[in-house]
From Swiss-Prot:
The chain crosses the membrane at residues 29-49, 61-81, 86-106, 132-152, 166-186, 213-233. It comes from Chaetosphaeridium globosum (Charophycean green alga). The keyword Protein transport applies. GO terms for biological process: protein transport. It is found in: Plastid, Chloroplast inner membrane. Belongs to the TIC214 family. This is Protein TIC 214. The keyword Ubl conjugation does not apply. GO terms for cellular component: chloroplast inner membrane. InterPro entries: TIC214.
Length: 1450
């Protein structure tokens, strides 16, 4: 038997090994692919994470099961086509799933309480089923609507060439299960770490997790909307010959229409003859083909594929051409590389020569250049014999023709190019032009009485007039100056002379061009301050921080003279009012107004309009009420492309803040110094905070905050686009509530009551339903009449108010009519879009009473009664039986006791009477006769009483026999037992409640005390274990205590410690002596060491204490300095602990073993343990510093600090640094990086050889009407607010030209360029050669040298320049080999090249993509023989059967 069993095992193992070895790579690869499918996190994974961290284990397990079943369904869709049609194809179910995701988000928002986030432990709970359904639905979502990476990973698995193999499929399934279970275990570990490591209670942390998951879910819900972001009724236009109704098509086909244009459509002009055609005029759109068509083989048949990849077709043509031309042979192989090299070098030389000849023609033949330039790139338009305007020829790739567009010169370039010279000074002027990109020149030129910037040249006439005005002012001032002030007179006369000289030079054309900076340089440096004083304007005002603009407008013509700081900063009011740019008032209702259709700035929205009639005039005045909300959303101008419209996402409709993309083009941030009144606003806030106490008026503040939030929401959603949707939904919600929702609820409620054999409540429900009525209000909440609708409610918005809102009750409680009449109040609320109710519009939500809570209460009561009733009946029956038996025994015992008591009484009487017998013998005989007579009387009376009792008993028995029919013994007993049981039940209930409560309280107290006691014991045992290990080291420490001084002095302070340490030579060690040396140096500088203690003064004490880091005063001194309350409490504490061990007049009692520290409390067990801990710490600190021999002595003389100090020493602690920027607004902080870049750039300009200097810029003030700002940096990039409206300045084409100037313009001579071209033509391409003659008329910002050559030549020249032809030829080219061994040598050489060169250049991410990521592996090339996924059509997911390699046609 043993041999047969062993042979069986051997055969089984060999067969198993054979089975494993064959499909081993497939199994491993399947496990790898299965594990990769679990790596990406989808929507359902987020649901599982949320349920595990918040709702507990059961709900997370259910969600996890839903995730796995969803993945199985996705696999089924790949392998089984009916499931593919059911799930993946766009149907109504998938659209409903998107709506379900929004409902899921809304459900998460409502779960904000602890009760909602409580863990559901039972499997029957509804939340567990919801969690399963959520994860299952989100896993099955269509990848068209919501991109799921798991589905694409599964597609890669299916497209593997061995996907039909069973071993691969099983191993893939096992790998996916392993990955999912690892994911679930990781979630359990994260939950455990949260519970253990968090400083917050876990229920509080649940709320934080739930709040952080809600925005993630909302973003995921918005992904399908972002994919189909175009809005049909806004962007789509009606096609020719198409019906205006969209009901002709099926509804899903409208959304998923393949013919619907999602890309820019070709644009052509109707009038092609006009050369100066503007792209925004007379445009029309036509739909054309968007895909690449190609023949392909599908299932053996040639078919046209519209999803055929264009890259594959190009590759096919290249392969066919290369195989036709290329032919290998042994003779041609040797000269292959050399021929190719010679050919490319000759081609490179030809291109370089061509470029050089064209550059030479630029300098020599000007007319040829313009002709050539006009034919190739565009045309020039002449204006006064100067080429100022240029029309560029733009090649549209989508059109097979060229169109000419006029390119305007950038408004960012304020100065003309002809003024720039090739000298060094011109180069710095060009650098300054970079600052001009932040200033709108168009605004400054159009504004009245505005001044040109510093870098522009001044006009001669304006300059002469300005100088004459200055001369008059100077002459007037010379009259007022006294004769004694010779210096000022000389300065004034010198200024007048310089002005006269400049006027004469300008008049005789000696000075042709001059700037304002050059004009200031003419004056002497000493005269500038006096010049500023003399050139002040007639109307002056100084700029203050707390400037009131309302008063400024009222007192426009008055004079103000105030000072801000040391210097006067002047401001002219009239010039400010002149420079204000008036905004245009749009007349929306006037038909003759023509708007600018080119710009994308929207007009201000009008809320309402009204007409005002004037008494004595026929005409009316139209009054417009504009909306408060701003709309900076870019408008779609006429003829805009589809690509421009497609980028208008739905969530970008509400960019009303400064963070909108509109301001990215013209955003200019201000520093904190630029923002007016910021400092004072902060002070006002702090001032008002002091009036509000933290304890009072809390409810008042909360109400104010809620009201502010409500007003903010009202202001935020006051938009026409929102009002259209919201008002329609509100009206639909009201109709749905009144006529659908509530009647259905009433019907089902009464039907269920009838099924449960309860009376129906139709009349009450319908009467309450009729009492609910609706009032339509304006958007602000102002009410209207009952049946009145507001005007233009779609555009202006609407609110719906509910009066006596109806909510369903399970039953009605009967109350008296009077109480209802007294307590009756009209309830009001406002309806929301989601169907809920609010107290005020956008206010607090009202929670309606739930329908199921009273039902649950009643059901729980009935269940409890049913459970406890049989137990109570058994208890009653047992008590009754016990009472019966007990009563019988008790009656018998009572009778016996009564009989015994009677007999005992009689015997006692007899005994007493016998004891009363007279002992005298004489009297006995005389009294016997009396006793006999007395006994006879007793017997007679007893007989009489007995007869009476018998008669009474007989009468009683007769009465009982007569009334047997009325009362029975059983009934009497039953009544007695019932009363007894009721009393017992009450007592038992009270006893149970009290007993359980007391037991719980006692157990809680015991558990708390035990835990405290256990923690104390554990802590002390650990300390004992540590201290026992250090006992030996502590004993060794005692041997070193002889060197230490005795510090048991009662009046101990820092100075005494330093003195004793110096005496005993302890501070020899470097580490100990580090801080001491610093103090000693400072003490030597103060010269206090040699002074006697008697001669020391208070100032000496201060100097000494300032040089020492810290000072710890003595106990006596501290006792005097401390406050009374603290002192008394400390003294009482010391007296209670150890009264005998401490006295202020005597020294402290200290044990012999401890000579270092004094203690003032009793010696307990805990105190002893603390002492040991302290000793160990002291030993560990001093162990490194025990080499204390041969130390220096008397480094510091004795100082006694026992005398009291009257002067306090203060230190700067906890003083807030106000220079630190706090509470910075998010709008400014977000753009900080741009502001810092600009600052660095401007600093670099102002450093070297620049004309703009601080003094010079400051001295320019009298020539220009502007604010006087001392910091030139702020003024240089100060941006006018109204220039935001100059939108044309910030277009993309003009910004591109500005960037080209910064990169490409370098004024180099043509000879240098020719030399560079001969050496390396790449450097020549980066610069444009311009001589002094051509620079005057040539528009250099339009082209580069690359434009002179064709596009193909440019690419070819760049590639040829990048190649290095000087390298030696590879080894595999030099060797003559046979065709058979050619592949071997090539493979070896390629391996060596790859190992040396390419692997070093590969990044880590590329290695991960090649070897770990599934979509980048080589096996995915085999996917093409099964399916080809379309990459061109990005809006849809399409598959098509293709071959792996296309047929190459000869």
């Amino acid at each position: 038997m043993i041999t047969t069993y062993s042979t069986f095992l051997f055969n089984f193992l060999s067969q198993f090994q054979y089975l494993v070895n064959i499909p081993e790579p497939l199994i491993l690869f399947g496990l790898y692919y299965g594990f990769l499918t679990t790596l990406p996190i989808s929507f359902s994974h987020i649901v599982v994470i949320r349920n595990r961290l918040i709702e507990g284990k059961t709900s997370s397990v259910m969600a996890f099961c839903g995730l796995i079943t969803g993945q199985l369904c996705m696999i089924g869709t790949i392998y089984y086509t009916p499931l593919y049609k059911l799930f993946i194809k766009p149907h109504l179910i998938l659209l409903l799933s998107i709506i379900y995701s929004f409902f899921y988000w809304q459900r998460l928002r409502n779960n904000q309480n602890y009760d909602d986030l409580r863990e559901a432990q039972s499997l029957i709970n509804v939340r567990n089923f919801f969690s399963f359904f959520d994860s299952f639905v989100f896993q099955i979502l269509n990848p068209i609507l919501l991109p799921t990476p798991i589905f694409f990973r599964l597609n890669n698995v299916f497209l593997f060439r061995y996907s039909n193999n069973l071993n691969f499929f099983l191993s893939f399934f096992i790998g996916s299960l392993i990955g999912n279970f690892l994911f679930f275990n990781a979630l359990n570990w994260i939950r455990y770490r949260f519970e253990q490591d968090s400083n917050v209670i876990y229920p509080v942390l649940k709320l934080l997790i739930n709040k952080s998951i809600i925005p993630i879910v909302f973003c995921i819900c918005l992904i399908p909307i972002a994919k189909y972001s175009h809005i049909p009724f806004c962007t789509m236009k009606q096609k020719e010959g198409q019906s205006s109704y969209s009901f002709d098509k099926n509804w899903p086909n409208i959304i998923f229409d393949s013919n619907q244009p999602h890309r820019p459509i070709r644009i052509f002009s109707e009038t092609k003859t006009d050369d100066n055609l503007n792209i925004n005029d007379n445009l029309s759109k036509k739909q054309t083909s968007q895909f690449f068509f190609k023949e392909c083989i599908s299932d053996g048949n040639v078919r046209i594929s519209y999803t055929y990849p264009s890259t594959l077709a190009n590759f096919q043509t290249d392969l066919s051409s290369s195989f036709q031309d290329f032919s290998l042979s042994e003779q041609s192989f040797d000269n292959l590389y050399s021929n190719w090299k010679l050919e490319k070098l000759s081609r490179k030389d030809n291109l370089n020569n061509l470029l050089l000849t064209k550059i030479k023609l630029l300098n020599n033949k000007k007319e040829w250049f313009y002709k050539h330039f006009q034919n190739k790139f565009g045309t020039f338009i002449k204006d006064d014999n100067n080429y100022n305007k240029f029309v560029k020829k733009s090649n549209d790739v989508r059109l097979k023709q060229s169109s000419k567009i006029q390119i305007k010169k950038s408004k960012l370039l304020t100065s003309d190019i002809r003024d720039i010279s090739t000298t060094q000074s011109g180069f710095y002027d060009l650098k300054k032009n970079k600052l001009k990109s932040f200033i709108s020149q168009k605004f400054k030129m159009n504004s009245n009485n505005s001044t040109l910037p510093v870098w522009n040249h001044l006009n001669k006439q304006l300059l002469q007039n300005e100088l004459k005005r200055i001369k008059k002012q100077l002459q007037d001032k010379t009259k007022n100056i006294k004769e004694n002030d010779f210096n000022n007179l000389k300065l004034l006369k010198s200024n007048i002379e310089t002005i006269d000289n400049t006027i004469n030079d300008i008049h005789h054309n000696k000075i042709k061009q001059i700037t304002s900076v050059d004009l200031i340089k003419i004056f002497a440096t000493n005269n500038k301050t006096l010049l500023l004083e003399t050139l002040a304007f007639n109307k002056k005002i100084t700029q203050k921080d707390n400037f009131n603009f309302n008063k400024l407008f009222q007192h426009k013509n008055k004079k103000f003279t105030t000072n801000s700081g040391n210097e006067n900063t002047y401001l002219n009011l009239n010039d400010i009012f002149k420079n204000i740019k008036r905004l245009p008032k749009w007349r929306t209702f006037s038909k003759h107004v023509v708007y600018d259709e080119v710009s994308d700035i929207r007009r201000r929205a009008i809320k309402s309009n009204s007409k005002l009639k004037i008494a004595n005039k026929d005409s009316d005045i139209i009054i417009f009420e504009y909306k408060k909300s701003l709309n900076f959303r870019a408008r779609l101008p006429k003829g805009s492309l589809r690509a421009r419209r497609k980028n208008k996402f739905t969530w970008k409709l509400f960019h009303n803040n400064l963070n909108s993309p509109f301001f990215i083009r013209s955003k200019q941030l201000l520093n904190k110094t630029d923002i007016p009144f910021l400092k004072y606003n902060e002070n006002y806030l702090n001032f008002f905070k002091n009036f509000i106490s933290p304890d009072k008026n809390i409810n008042y503040l909360n109400n104010d905050i809620s009201e502010m939030r409500r007003q903010e929401l009202l202001f935020k959603w006051d938009k026409t686009n929102v009002h259209i949707l919201r008002s329609m939904v509100l009206v639909g919600q009201a109709f749905f509530r009144k006529y659908i929702k509530l009647p259905i609820f009433i019907f089902f409620k009464n039907l269920s009551r009838q099924l449960l054999y309860q009376p129906s409540e139709w009349t009450k429900d319908w009467s309450n339903w009729m009492n609910e009525w609706y009032i339509f209000c304006y958007y602000d909440g102002t009410e209207l009449a009952k049946d009145q609708w507001p005007e233009m409610w779609l555009q202006r918005g609407i609110q719906i108010k509910l009066i006596n809102p109806f909510y369903i009750k399970p039953w009605y409680i009967q109350k008296s009519f009077i109480k209802n009449k007294q307590n009756k109040k009209t309830r009001t609320s406002y309806l929301t879009v989601f169907g809920s109710q609010q107290e005020l519009p956008f206010g607090k939500k009202i929670r309606m009473p739930s329908f199921w809570k009273p039902v649950r209460r009643e059901v729980s009561k009935s269940i409890k009664l049913k459970l406890y009733f049989p137990f109570l009946t058994l208890q009653k029956n047992t008590i009754i039986l016990f009472e019966k038996v007990f009563n019988k025994k008790r009656i018998n015992e009572d009778n016996k006791t009564i009989e015994k008591s009677i007999l005992n009484k009689k015997n006692e009487q007899l005994i007493l009477k016998k004891d009363e017998v007279i002992p005298n013998n004489k009297s006995i005989a005389g009294k016997l006769s009396k006793l006999d007579f007395h006994n006879q009387n007793i017997t007679k009376t007893s007989i009489k009483n007995a007869t009476k009792q018998i008669l009474i008993k007989n009468e009683y028995n007769s009465l009982l026999k007569e009334n047997k029919n009325l009362f029975t013994k059983n009934k009497i007993v039953f009544l007695k037992i019932k009363n007894i049981l009721n009393k017992l039940n009450l007592k038992l209930i009270k006893v149970k409640i009290n007993f359980t409560y007391k037991i719980k309280t006692v157990l809680k107290i015991i558990s708390r005390n035990l835990l405290k006691f256990y923690s104390i014991i554990q802590f002390q045992l650990e300390n004992l274990g540590r201290n026992n290990s250090n006992d030996l080291s502590y004993k060794n420490q005692l041997s070193y205590q002889k060197d230490f001084p005795n510090f048991n002095n009662f009046c101990l302070n820092q100075a005494n410690i330093i003195q004793n340490l110096c005496k005993n030579n302890i501070l020899k060690h470097k580490k100990l002596n580090q801080n001491f040396q610093i103090n000693s140096k400072n003490l030597n500088q103060t010269n206090i060491i040699d002074v006697n203690p008697e001669n020391i003064k208070a100032q000496d004490f201060k100097n000494l204490l300032e040089n020492i880091y810290t000072f710890t005063p003595t106990i006596n001194l501290w006792d005097k300095l401390s406050t009374n309350n603290w002192k008394i409490s400390v003294q009482n504490n010391w007296k209670q602990k150890s009264y005998n061990n401490y006295d202020l007049t005597k020294k402290a009692l200290v044990s012999k073993n401890l000579n270092f520290i004094s203690y003032f409390y009793q010696n307990n067990l805990i105190n002893n343990l603390n002492k040991k801990i302290k000793h160990t710490k002291i030993f560990n600190l001093s162990k490194n510093y025990l080499s204390l021999n041969n130390l220096n002595q008397n480094q510091i003389k004795n100082f006694d600090f026992q005398n009291s100090l009257n002067n306090n020493i203060t230190y700067k602690k906890n003083i807030k640094n106000f220079t630190i920027r706090q509470n910075v607004p998010s709008q400014l902080r977000r753009w900080d990086w741009k502001n810092n870049k600009i600052k660095k750039f401007v600093n670099r300009l102002l450093q070297k050889n620049t004309i703009l200097l601080k003094e010079e810029v400051f001295n320019l003030i009298p020539f220009f009407d502007r604010f006087t700002i001392q910091n030139p940096m702020i003024r240089n990039w100060s941006h006018p607010i109204s220039s935001i409206l100059d939108d044309e300045i910030f277009t993309y084409e003009l910004l591109d030209t500005f960037l080209q100037i910064n990169k490409n313009i370098d004024f180099l001579h043509t000879k240098q360029i020719e030399d560079n071209l001969s050496s390396n033509s790449n450097q020549a391409i980066a610069s444009l050669p311009l001589s002094s003659t051509t620079a005057e008329n040539f528009l250099y910002y339009l082209t580069t040298v690359e434009d002179l050559i064709s596009i193909e030549d440019k690419k070819e020249l760049k590639i040829l320049n990048s190649l290095n032809f000087n390298k030696s030829t590879p080894n595999y080219i030099k060797t003559n080999v046979v065709e058979k061994s050619l592949n071997e040598n090539l493979s070896k050489n390629l391996q060596s090249i790859l190992s040396k060169e390419t692997l070093d250049s590969i990044n880590n991410t590329q290695i991960l993509k090649k070897f770990l990521w599934a979509s980048y592996r080589c096996e995915d090339l085999a996917c093409m023989n099964r399916f080809w996924f379309s990459t061109n059509n990005g809006s849809r997911f399409g598959t098509l059967r293709l071959r792996l390699y296309p047929n190459l046609k000869n």
